[in-house]
Amino acid sequence: MKTGYFLLEDGNKIEFELYPEAAPGTVANFEKLANEGFYDGLTFHRVIPGFVSQGGCPHGTGTGGPGYTIKCETEGNPHTHEAGALSMAHAGKDTGGSQFFIVHEPQPHLNGVHTVFGKVTSGLEFAKNMSNGDVMKEVRVEG
């Protein structure tokens, strides 16, 4: 099983598991970016209480990415946008890259539109209580 964590600058830790069987390309991309240090020092630039905490933009504005895009993996993916889901942000089908979000409360309207590739297993309260601009000190994937 692939697991990992977001270590926030304030010392709080959000732990997660990933779903490589449901979203192999998305998980491989996220793991590569995390373990290369791409996310280290980036912010959660879009935090909407009761909805999502979104991060992974190198510009901190929601307009950037890694310089490439990945395909959506929604077809046949059994995972839904329940509380704690990790999902890829995008500007339209197959335009995701590095931006992702953590779901605060169930968001069924996102099912089949965004790729769920994991779930928070510990520390969801830290995602729900963060503010725009909170920094990811370190993000890693293990296993």
UniProtKB/Swiss-Prot annotation:
It catalyses: [protein]-peptidylproline (omega=180) = [protein]-peptidylproline (omega=0). Its EC number is 5.2.1.8. The keyword Isomerase applies. The keyword Transferase does not apply. GO terms for molecular function: peptidyl-prolyl cis-trans isomerase activity. The gene is ppiB. Keywords: Cytoplasm, Isomerase, Rotamase. It comes from Bacillus subtilis (strain 168). Signal peptide: none annotated. One of its GO terms (cellular component) is cytoplasm. Belongs to the cyclophilin-type PPIase family. Residues 1-143 form the PPIase cyclophilin-type domain. Inhibited by cyclosporin A (CsA). It comes from the Bacteria. One of its GO terms (biological process) is protein folding. It is found in: Cytoplasm. PPIases accelerate the folding of proteins. It catalyzes the cis-trans isomerization of proline imidic peptide bonds in oligopeptides. This is Peptidyl-prolyl cis-trans isomerase B. The lineage of its organism: Bacteria, Bacillati, Bacillota, Bacilli, Bacillales.
